[in-house]
Amino acid sequence: MSAAGVRSTRQRAAISTLLETLDDFRSAQELHDELRRRGENIGLTTVYRTLQSMASSGLVDTLHTDTGESVYRRCSEHHHHHLVCRSCGSTIEVGDHEVEAWAAEVATKHGFSDVSHTIEIFGTCSDCRS
């Protein structure tokens, strides 16, 4: 087991190594295709299961695109949110005290406690607008 409580396997190591080389979010299919291109013989189902396990352990970020597809990226170590371009998929991590304060205020207003949240904001980046 690793520090995050995830069992270490050859497949998990290959997926983790690949994710470390990428800056952007990728679908399980895209990751599977890249692993095969690199000579890794890992089934698509194994890629999906491994990504789910890594996401549950906080090792990868999962983002649901506006089309409903799940995409994955190596997780930053700090709490953050995402701005996502609908056109090119470019993603920017944002951490903002105002977002955290707003989330806490809304939760308190509605009687919630022990709250966690994820926020994904979709729009069009400046490069795609040009």
From Swiss-Prot:
Induction: Induced by zinc. Repressed by SmtB in the absence of zinc. Zn(2+) 2 binds at C85, C88, C125, C128. Its cofactor is Zn(2+). Its main location: cytoplasm. It comes from the Bacteria. GO terms for molecular function: DNA-binding transcription factor activity; DNA-binding transcription repressor activity; protein homodimerization activity; transcription cis-regulatory region binding; zinc ion binding. Binds 2 Zn(2+) ions per subunit. Three distinct zinc binding-sites were identified in the crystal structure, but the exact biological function of the third site remains to be determined. It could be an artifact of crystallization. The keyword Transcription regulation applies. It holds the Pfam family FUR. Zn(2+) 3 binds at H79, H81, E100, H117. Signal peptide: none annotated. The N-terminal domain binds DNA and the C-terminal domain is involved in metal-binding and dimerization. Belongs to the Fur family. Homodimer. This is Zinc uptake regulation protein. The gene is zur.
